[in-house]
Amino acid sequence: MAPARQELQHESRCRPSRTVDAWRAAVATRGRHMETPGYRRRTRCGGWGLPRSVSSLAAVGLLCTALTTFICWGQLPPLPWASPAPQRLVGVLLWWEPFRGRGGYPKSPPDCSLRFNISGCRLLTDRAAYGEAQAVLFHHRDLVKELHDWPPPWGARERTDKALVLRVFDDQEGAVTLTGKALETVGSRPPGQRWVWMNFESPSHTPGLRGLAKDLFNWTLSYRTDSDVFVPYGFLYSRSDPTEQPSGLGPQLARKRGLVAWVVSNWNEHQARVRYYHQLSRHVSVDVFGRTGPGRPVPAIGLLHTVARYKFYLAFENSRHVDYITEKLWRNAFLAGAVPVVLGPDRANYERFVPRGAFIHVDDFPNAASLAAYLLFLDRNVAVYRRYFRWRRSFAVHITSFWDEQWCRTCQAVQTSGDQPKSIHNLADWFQR
């Protein structure tokens, strides 16, 4: 794929971005001193950006952005834009509809060929077809709640059976570990069948992980780039026609009347994002929407149309972990056309997925007051603010379709993986590192 257009070529991270340059010049003109992004890092960096020690990592991240999905997202060829290739028929059984399905009832399986150009998939929900499935998907949240509802012979048995108590959790979780020896005793799963552990929560919100038996699962499916089946919450792809107007709501700058918006569904005063909000709101007005905390109900026009009226959106994750970049960035901010202010993994991690100039990171500022001053500066300087939208000329946003896309991607992975045996020895050690 051709590299991104020249305007998206990113500067060294030991140099200030043009937006920060303009801000610094404006402050100097007013004859006032103001801390700018990277203020505390000048001596190490020789400028206003990040330390030289991370420059090589930044270069990798920027190259990944220029080549869009084909380096970091090697497992994610474009979905609706590539021609399907004939593949062997693969059956994938979804053991539980995640969170018991939307509205409390399971949906019909998607057509992978029609939706994602992935052919040769037989998506199953009937557990009677367990023996015919090449892969079985287990959603972690449902897995820990349904201890009795596992596939045979690992499912429910009499707890009084002292010869072998079949459970998948250890004593810390109130049950007994299902060991490799026990697996041999009761029988094995169908030859070549893969058990796939699926999870899209952060390690901080993944209970019961330490209790899972070792070597029980063959593959992982998550937002982590080192998963066996990697499916992020979203990604960017190159526009076929750079002159084409961005789809969706887009920036629509003339309609933006508010400054900062935040939609939050889980309010916890102990979370870093809530603490940072309290600090930020002392210096700049933040309109909070949601049913918890100080939030007010989202207007009837809907979340995206509401956020589209604001210049900035707080894409604050509930916890900070590697690759944990959720719909708060991809959907709530990018799709609505607001500039995201992110709190999550570090900047280098974000730059593996999106251009440097597409977002503002809280870590670029010594404190919330400095960030607030920068947002107010951008509010007064429209030309500088518009620079945060330049990436849209070359890239468009793909939003992952939960849970259909994960289902179809698992099928695709089975088709292309061959028959190499593999098992995950310790999920907790991998996911929580």
From Swiss-Prot:
One MF term in the entry's GO annotations: 4-galactosyl-N-acetylglucosaminide 3-alpha-L-fucosyltransferase activity
Tagged with keyword Nucleotidyltransferase: no
Pathway: Protein modification; protein glycosylation
EC number: 2.4.1.152
Pfam families given in the database record: Glyco_tran_10_N, Glyco_transf_10
Segments in the Cytoplasmic topological domain: 1-52
Catalytic activities: a beta-D-galactosyl-(1->4)-N-acetyl-beta-D-glucosaminyl derivative + GDP-beta-L-fucose = a beta-D-galactosyl-(1->4)-[alpha-L-fucosyl-(1->3)]-N-acetyl-beta-D-glucosaminyl derivative + GDP + H(+); an N-acetyl-alpha-neuraminyl-(2->3)-beta-D-galactosyl-(1->4)-N-acetyl-beta-D-glucosaminyl derivative + GDP-beta-L-fucose = an alpha-Neu5Ac-(2->3)-beta-D-Gal-(1->4)-[alpha-L-Fuc-(1->3)]-beta-D-GlcNAc derivative + GDP + H(+); an alpha-Neu5Ac-(2->3)-beta-D-Gal-(1->4)-beta-D-GlcNAc-(1->3)-beta-D-Gal-(1->4)-beta-D-GlcNAc derivative + GDP-beta-L-fucose = an alpha-Neu5Ac-(2->3)-beta-D-Gal-(1->4)-beta-D-GlcNAc-(1->3)-beta-D-Gal-(1->4)-[alpha-L-Fuc-(1->3)]-beta-D-GlcNAc derivative + GDP + H(+); an alpha-Neu5Ac-(2->3)-beta-D-Gal-(1->4)-beta-D-GlcNAc6S derivative + GDP-beta-L-fucose = an alpha-Neu5Ac-(2->3)-beta-D-Gal-(1->4)-[alpha-L-Fuc-(1->3)]-beta-D-GlcNAc6S derivative + GDP + H(+)
Glycosylation sites: N117, N218
Broad class of where this protein is predominantly found: Golgi
InterPro entries: Glyco_tran_10_C, Glyco_tran_10_N, Glyco_trans_10, GT10-like_C_sf
Keyword Zinc: no
Localization per record: Golgi apparatus, Golgi stack membrane
Enzymatic class: transferase
Tissue expression per record: Highest expression in stomach and colon. It is also expressed in the lung, testis, uterus, small intestine and to a lesser extent in spleen, and ovary. Present in trace amounts in brain, thymus, heart, smooth muscle, kidney and bone marrow. Not found in liver, salivary gland and pancreas.
Positions in the Lumenal compartment: 75-433
GO cellular component, one term: trans-Golgi network
Record's bilayer topology term: Single-pass type II membrane protein
Transmembrane regions listed in the UniProt entry: 53-74
Reported phenotype of the disruption mutant: Mice are born at the expected Mendelian rate. No visible phenotype; likely due to the redundancy with FUT7. Simultaneous knockdown of FUT4 and FUT7 results in leukocytosis characterized by an 18.4 fold increase in blood neutrophils and significant increases in blood monocytes, eosinophils, and lymphocytes numbers.
Function, as annotated: Catalyzes alpha(1->3) linkage of fucosyl moiety transferred from GDP-beta-L-fucose to N-acetyl glucosamine (GlcNAc) within type 2 lactosamine (LacNAc, Gal-beta(1->4)GlcNAc) glycan attached to N- or O-linked glycoproteins. Robustly fucosylates nonsialylated distal LacNAc unit of the polylactosamine chain to form Lewis X antigen (CD15), a glycan determinant known to mediate important cellular functions in development and immunity.
Family classification: Belongs to the glycosyltransferase 10 family.
Protein's name according to its UniProt entry: Alpha-(1,3)-fucosyltransferase 4
Source species: Mus musculus
